[in-house]
UniProtKB/Swiss-Prot annotation:
Annotated gene: gcvH
Annotated organism of origin: Staphylococcus epidermidis (strain ATCC 35984 / DSM 28319 / BCRC 17069 / CCUG 31568 / BM 3577 / RP62A)
Keyword Acyltransferase: no
Alphabetical list of InterPro entries matching this protein: 2-oxoA_DH_lipoyl-BS, Biotin_lipoyl, GCV_H, GCV_H/Fam206, GCV_H_sub, Single_hybrid_motif
Positions of the Lipoyl-binding domain: 22-104
Cofactor note text: Binds 1 lipoyl cofactor covalently.
Modification N6-lipoyllysine, positions: K63
Protein name (Swiss-Prot/TrEMBL): Glycine cleavage system H protein
Length: 126
């Protein structure tokens, strides 16, 4: 199972890619695999403010609905609107096409609380 080494991870199975002061966030391959076929993705509005741990949307699969949790605090600067029409991207391309939101980071220190790829792999038993 892919766990890209350049990303950080949350214990709730979100991945975080940092570029400058913006974090791109999605769910991991492990999470989408556990959920099964994704049929709907609900995402927030641009400019919404999030605190670490806030729910910012949900993914619905044929099995269940799972909340999405903000791994860091900040302001949403972009939302992947393609997922509204193509939720299957979450299964097909969790680390590329299926990014969910981009957040302007408001507290850099929260990045230290995220897991490395090795720590995340250990957590999921890989």
């Amino acid at each position: 199972m892919a766990v890209p080494s350049e990303f950080k991870y949350s214990k709730e199975h979100e991945w975080v890619k940092i570029e400058n002061n913006v974090a791109t966030i999605g769910i991991t391959e492990y999470a989408q695999n556990e959920l099964g076929d994704i049929v709907f993705v609900e995402l927030p509005e641009t400019d919404d403010e999030l605190n670490e741990g806030d729910t910012f949307g949900s993914v619905e699969s044929v099995k269940t609905v799972s909340e999405l949790y903000a791994p860091i605090s900040g302001k949403i600067v972009e939302v992947n609107e393609e997922l509204e029409d193509s939720p299957e991207f979450v299964n097909e391309s969790p680390y590329e096409k299926a990014w969910m939101v981009k957040i302007e980071i408001s507290d850099d220190s929260q990045l230290e609380e995220l897991l490395s790829a090795d720590q995340y792999s250990e957590m999921i038993g890989e």
